[in-house]
């Protein structure tokens, strides 16, 4: 929500006072528009059901859920917000004392091959960072991705940095106050 207000919370991650100031502004804005909120996140299935029935008209959600709904009903589309989508890339980690580091690298290299990564994408609905995999992804999923994320949207993704200790607690307290507000 901060990005839509022209604020950059990620730039304030190393300055707790500045981050707290941003969160206070976000809290005030969220309380101001609380009458537009039907519900708060409890799970993906609930969110998809609310959109399917038309009980809600817009939602903040992951792209894969939006693409699933679009496959069911072309009138429902997932679009990146003008202020920028939030982005992260799931990663692989090998423990320092791994018993078979060579096998771990072989597995990572295997699943990141474009053809294999595309199979995972086709099964999960989540897109992949494997370069060239889009050539092997089902056409409808690939087209939905391209419709949601044109080059401008990709260039405007706000990539999550590591979250410093204590900020998630602060965010949770803001959400508690927003939910409790009249």
Residue map of PLM features:
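Periplasmic-binding protein-like
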Residues: 29-33, 72-96, 141
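Conserved C-terminal helix/tail region of periplasmic/extracytoplasmic solute-binding proteins
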Residues: 49, 151-182
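Non-transmembrane alpha-helical segments in soluble domains
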Residues: 1-2, 27-31, 48, 52, ...
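Extracytoplasmic/periplasmic, Sec-exported soluble proteins
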Residues: 18, 22, 39-43, 86, ...
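Mature extracytoplasmic/periplasmic domains
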Residues: 85-86, 90, 95-155
């Amino acid at each position: 929500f901060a990005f839509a207000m022209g604020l950059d919370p990620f730039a304030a991650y190393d300055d707790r006072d500045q981050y707290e100031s941003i969160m206070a502004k976000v809290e005030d804005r969220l309380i101001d528009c609380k009458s537009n909120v039907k519900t708060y996140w409890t799970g993906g299935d609930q969110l998809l059901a609310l959109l399917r029935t038309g009980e809600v008209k817009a939602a903040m959600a992951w792209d894969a859920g939006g693409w699933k709904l679009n496959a069911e009903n072309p009138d429902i589309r997932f679009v990146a917000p003008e202020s920028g989508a939030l982005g992260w890339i799931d990663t692989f980690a090998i423990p320092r004392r791994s018993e078979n580091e060579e096998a771990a690298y072989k597995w990572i290299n295997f699943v990141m091959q474009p053809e294999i990564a595309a199979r995972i994408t086709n099964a999960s609905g989540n897109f992949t960072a494997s370069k060239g995999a889009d050539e092997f992804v089902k056409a409808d999923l690939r087209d939905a991705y391209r419709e949601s994320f044109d080059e401008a949207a990709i260039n405007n993704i706000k990539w999550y940095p590591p979250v410093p200790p204590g900020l998630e607690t602060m965010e949770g307290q803001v959400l508690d106050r927003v939910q409790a507000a009249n």
